[in-house]
């Protein structure tokens, strides 16, 4: 149970003078009033013991047999009933001390009790963490939140949020709330739309992020902005993403360069980690890895650096190879990649079959490998390779007897991603330290990419990022060679946030969009309000917005984002407790000038 600060004391009133979890040695012989929930109740031959719980912890109450009126009052109490008691704190005998409780050296002999709320039988127990379906937990979330682990998660989240605020305020950030009702943007995820009663046929949108507002705050002359910002996106749920609503630590700064922002963020994560957890940051300052390098080495722009495996490029070894599958993938834009598992060359056939199955799931046509055994190399491609090739391969990759090497070949990006997926697949072979936090920055993202379907140049990520080299780069370089001032912060394979140094120059913005096929008129139509603001004096600026929910997940070792949110939706974007979304009254629709046009009901097969 969450342990409150020792200095934390309740308001003294008729309900309580003390908290359950703060009583201990030194409290003996004191008269106290306590209020809370009946965590457990036990009848031991006339003595009734009640474990009373509040948000600070549990303490044991004793009702003695001679107190017949009290005995009768509590005898039939259900678990989770709310009571207020008066009594005297006494020390427990040495043989009855409970070392699992902070208050385990004392108990309270009850002299009076008031039953504030006699609970009905519960849909699932609070005191015992028995497996319970998520559907039931979300329907009765107010009961679920009483359970120790999730209760601690929510208190932890509150304390972390307060620490973030203090950290940023000490560095002259100004907390500013931006609008919740704003205009719809067709880019990105789907918007949640809100119809306007006063303007029939028109809609507000809930913000997917305060992106444009925070940039306009920089134009307004505020040097450093932040808020714990609610964001709304109509997208599907994942284990690390809540449908509908999430919170981010939204930040923007004027007159900064990329490294200035990195320094602020690294300091904040270090401060939170050291003060809120027992975890360790493996490298500080956080390593900076370019997009090209991270894909080559780890096959992902969200690498888990704890995994002691790196992808190696062996393209040059197979330029003149007799193995045509590899030789044909040594030209520009293609590659041959290798992943070495030390000491795993003697694994069973099932091990390799499962690995190949995973590779196919990732999009590969198969999975080539070579086992280096005492009797010599084994594997499906050994017969295609000469002895000299094998020796060069062993030397370059540092291969020894007992090792196995896996290969991928094809287009550079897809091959990197497949091998990166295999790297994660093989991570289960290693005992990764869950208390290590391996942060890194991914930098130097490409500004543009080629859209194979549309046969045109598109923006790779954020179209409002400043290109590295600014206008000169746009005028003199090939689009696919231009890099952007974009960056991601990643921890243990989880992307916490993307950010960028913004493009605050209208002339550069028009040219950047022109390369991606947009006319000046199209840019003005979509983003005119931003460009107009930038024409009236905009400072260089940049920002980032780490996910609050994901940060709590990492520090609390939670795999599911719903474990760190007080009232989350389920994976179908439903609030089971409040029965949302729900139908509304016809009069409400009429006031909004709306009619419902439902899709036809699909017949069950």
Swiss-Prot record:
Domain of life: Bacteria
Binding site for ATP: 233-235, 495, 547-550
PROSITE patterns the record matches: AA_TRNA_LIGASE_II (PS50862)
Catalysed transformations (reactions): tRNA(Asx) + L-aspartate + ATP = L-aspartyl-tRNA(Asx) + AMP + diphosphate
UniProt site positions, description: Important for tRNA non-discrimination: 44
Cited Pfam families: GAD, tRNA-synt_2, tRNA_anti-codon
One GO MF term: nucleic acid binding
Biological process, per Gene Ontology: aspartyl-tRNA aminoacylation
Cited SUPFAM superfamilies: Class II aaRS and biotin synthetases, GAD domain-like, Nucleic acid-binding proteins
Binding site for L-aspartate: 187, 233, 461, 502
Enzyme type, top EC level: ligase
Main location: cytoplasm
Name assigned to this protein: Aspartate--tRNA(Asp/Asn) ligase
């Amino acid at each position: 149970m969450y342990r409150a600060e020792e200095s934390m004391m309740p308001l003294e009133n008729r309900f309580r003078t003390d908290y359950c979890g703060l009583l201990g040695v030194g409290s003996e012989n004191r008269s106290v009033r306590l209020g809370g929930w009946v965590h457990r109740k036990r009848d031991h031959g006339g003595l009734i013991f009640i474990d009373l719980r509040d948000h600070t912890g549990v303490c044991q109450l004793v009702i003695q047999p001679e107190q017949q009126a009290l005995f009768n009052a509590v005898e039939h109490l259900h678990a989770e009933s709310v009571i207020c008691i008066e009594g005297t704190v006494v020390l427990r005998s040495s043989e009855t001390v409970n070392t699992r409780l902070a208050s385990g050296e004392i108990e309270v002999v009850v002299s009076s009790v008031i039953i504030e709320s006699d609970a009905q039988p519960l849909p699932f127990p609070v005191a015992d963490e028995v497996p319970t379906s998520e559907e039931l937990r979300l329907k009765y979330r107010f009961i679920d939140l009483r359970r120790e682990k999730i209760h601690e998660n929510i208190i932890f989240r509150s304390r972390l949020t307060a620490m973030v605020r203090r950290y940023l305020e000490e560095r002259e950030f100004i907390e500013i709330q931006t609008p919740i009702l704003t205009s719809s943007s067709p880019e990105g995820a789907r918007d949640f739309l809100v119809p306007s009663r006063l303007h029939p046929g028109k809609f507000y949108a809930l913000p997917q992020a305060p992106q444009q507002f925070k940039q306009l705050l920089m134009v307004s002359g505020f040097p450093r902005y932040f808020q714990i910002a609610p964001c709304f996106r109509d997208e599907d749920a994942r284990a690390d993403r809540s449908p509908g609503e999430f919170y981010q630590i939204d930040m923007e700064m004027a007159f900064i360069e990329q490294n200035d922002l990195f320094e602020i963020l690294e300091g904040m994560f270090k401060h939170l980690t050291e003060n809120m957890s027992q975890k360790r940051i493996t490298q500080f300052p956080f390593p900076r890895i370019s997009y090209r390098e991270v894909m080559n080495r780890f096959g992902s722009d969200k690498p888990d650096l704890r995994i002691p495996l790196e992808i190696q490029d062996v393209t040059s070894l197979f330029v003149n190879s007799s193995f045509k599958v590899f030789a044909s993938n040594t030209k520009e834009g293609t590659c041959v990649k290798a992943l070495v598992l030390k000491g795993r060359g003697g694994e069973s056939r099932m091990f390799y079959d499962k690995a190949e199955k995973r590779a196919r799931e990732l999009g590969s046509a198969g999975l080539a490998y070579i086992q280096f055994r005492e009797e010599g190399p084994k594997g499906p491609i050994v017969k295609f390779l000469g002895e000299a090739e094998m020796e060069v391969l062993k030397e370059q990759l540092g291969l020894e007897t007992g090792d196995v090497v896996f290969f991928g070949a094809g287009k550079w990006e897809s091959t990197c991603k497949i091998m990166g997926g295999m790297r994660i697949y093989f991570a289960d072979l290693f005992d990764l330290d869950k208390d290590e936090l391996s942060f890194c920055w991914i930098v130097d993202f490409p500004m543009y990419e080629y859209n194979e379907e549309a046969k045109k140049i598109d923006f790779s990520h954020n179209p409002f990022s400043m290109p590295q080299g600014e206008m000169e780069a746009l005028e003199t370089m090939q689009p696919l060679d231009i890099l952007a001032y974009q960056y991601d912060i990643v921890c243990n394979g989880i992307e916490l946030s993307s950010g960028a140094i913004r493009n605050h120059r209208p002339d550069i913005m028009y040219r950047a969009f022109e390369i991606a096929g947009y006319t000046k008129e199209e840019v003005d139509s979509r983003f005119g309000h931003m460009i107009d603001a930038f024409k009236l004096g905009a400072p260089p600026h940049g920002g980032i917005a780490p996910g609050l929910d994901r940060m709590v997940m990492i520090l609390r070792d939670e795999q599911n984002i719903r474990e760190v949110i007080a009232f989350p939706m389920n994976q179908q974007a439903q609030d089971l407790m409040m029965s949302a979304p729900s139908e509304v009254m016809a009069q409400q629709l009429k006031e909004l000038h709306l009619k419902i046009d439902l899709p036809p009901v699909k017949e069950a097969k």
